[in-house]
Amino acid sequence: MNRITRKSCLFAIIFASLFVTHALGAAIDPPRRPHNVKPFHNGNLELQRRANEPFFEIDVKSLNTNSPISELCKKDLHVIESSHDLFHLQNQCEFILGSLKVTNYDSNILDLNSLRAIGGDLIIQDSPELIRIQAGNLNKIEGLFQLQGLTSLVSVEIPTLKFCQSLEWKVVPILNYVSMDSQNIEIIKDIVISDTSLANIENFNKVQEIDTFNINNNRFLETIHSNVKTIRGQFSVHANAKELELEMPHLREVENITIRDTSLVYLPQLTKVKSSLEFIENYFYELNLNNLQKIGGTLGIINNVNLIKVNLENLTDIQGGLMIADNESLEDITFLPNLKQIGGAIFFEGSFKDIMFDSLKLVKGSAFIKSSSNVLDCNKWTNPSNGRSIIRGGKFTCISGKKENTLNVKQDGTIIEKGYKDLTQEGEDSKKRVISKYANSANPSMQLDPLLFGTCLVAMLLF
């Protein structure tokens, strides 16, 4: 009995010692979650990178044929036609020095998640089976990023891409989803997006200067927004959705601009166009380019059916021609008060009632003005106050309603000849000549029955 009592006391002492040790340890070092990870932060389900952890970037150009990477990764061109080819490449390479071309790919998904950098171009083309492209770790494409002829492609996921020289996507007709860090990607040469189902093309905040900006034939595209400042070559937007709103709030200088089929154009900082500027078949009501000062080629404002207001108050020089035609809601051309010179010809046609150029001193080409309105006064052009015409291109024609005035001038503006024609009378004479032709025809089969002749005569004189 005493033995049992002693054993019980021993167990009690051991248990008490363990309890005290555990309690003291807990007080000194409280329990922590594994790695101190908070799985969700402020309700955000995305895992966030620590602030002091730099984003991975690689300079592919620093790698060379002597770098300690697989010989496979140093090839100038990799052609991938199957998932087996791709597995073999990605099993050995995170970085490739040359270009990657995917063509006639045999799978629905192109998984490039193992690649981090491409030293040449990434070209994915002519793969009608391809539905999705994913490249979750791809950071840099030193050359062209091209998608072309991918008729089943729906989504592109490239969330970490920070640089490519040019972006060219053509004939990807059902592409409607792109996961891309467009606010941080840098593109230094061309942006061409054609024949997609994208609804928005936005941001490109780091894109400051490029050679080409061409967005066309994207039938569902409703918004284009970019912070680009200079376009060294062609800036073209056309054949997208009629509701398209184009906003380039920082654009200052462009080589050449053609804008069609838009409902809004916002270019508040545009100062200089080195070549031509054309707005054709748009749906906007107002065109405000109040900071534009010089156009190195032709200015064309053509067939914009809703246009009622234009602001070009600071434009002083057009080195090419000036064409304003078929803008059926535009009632006057008085929006160029500081224009001093037109280096080419003038062509105006519409229903405008007034034309006014307060500062215009010289038109180096000819001029043709035609308005269906009888209110337009051609005399201010045909009877210059100082006796010399500002038109120096040889001939001037102004048609107001049914009246036509013409001038022939020398290169110094001296008027050689004036002309006037009543187009109403000319129309009546033309009708009479047609009737006379049939009435006096020597061929009996061509002669008119007197009753029919009388009916034709009345109809033609009335109409």
UniProtKB/Swiss-Prot annotation:
Membrane topology: Lipid-anchor; GPI-anchor
Protein name: Sporulation-specific protein 22
Record family assignment: Belongs to the SPS2 family.
GO CC terms, sorted: cytosol; plasma membrane; side of membrane
Keyword Transcription annotated: no
UniProt entry keywords in alphabetical sequence: Cell membrane, Glycoprotein, GPI-anchor, Leucine-rich repeat, Lipoprotein, Membrane, Repeat, Signal, Sporulation
Gene that encodes it: SPS22
Top-level taxon in the UniProt lineage: Eukaryota
